[in-house]
Amino acid sequence: MFGYRPDGILVRGIDPIQKIIPHIMTLRYDAQNMTHYDCECAPLDVFIREQEQKGERFNYMHILIAGIVRGIALYPRLNRFVMNGRIFARKGIFISFVVKKRLNFTASDSLVKLEFTGHETLLEVRDKVDRAIIDNARTEANNNTDKAARLLTFTPNIVLKILMRLIKWMDRHGLIPNVLLKMSPFHTSAFVSNLKSIKGPSIYHHLYEFGTTGLFFAMGKESADTHRMPVEIVMDERFCDGFYYVRALNELKRLMENPQQLLTPLETLPEDVEVADPYRFFACKK
């Protein structure tokens, strides 16, 4: 409330136009832009084979998530979100994705959210992703999100509606408990969908109005003709301008196609300047 949230820092040092934009486009899905990138598979395949000879196993999902984490760390404005007309800088980097317990029509899904610092190497990202998949792929496995969802479904429909409206109201006003924010996969820096793993095409996935998701990445099966993997990206335009997005996403593509750069940690994290110097737009010009 009053600009305070346990999961974010209010960004004050923004220009007037950017401050007004969230009040013009109040809904996240009304402010979403979409773009398409084709990533060359050849350098990824060469890298994966070379690492396999050294005893390290990687896949495209590992590289994509590691690239997103590194890209957000290098371009911290990507890690902002809009809530109740205000722009916040997120505390921590979070990636959410779905784990399918079995590849059949009746198998259930688990929603997983992982936290990163931005310093991680590709190996550290891989280990964290693989552990989450192993822990949640078991049929009997239930993470905290699964347990909370199951508990809510035991309530009558009218009660569930009231509870969800209350949670959304609390979220808008910064009153939602931090334990729920940590549990919610919808309060995340980016959602990732690996449709390539089920031989599906990439899609433009909408941004969720509930929560704070600002980016959605979906990668699909590579083309047999061009040997390129499609990656569709949907983004909230309210907290970043086009110039910043283009630079950041081009860097992400470069990292994806040069994954060896992700083997070394990022020692220094760039600051979100408008958070570090919140009153720079109000400083007196000499």
What is the predicted role of each segment?
Residues 1-286:
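C-terminal catalytic/motor cores of large multi-domain enzyme assemblies
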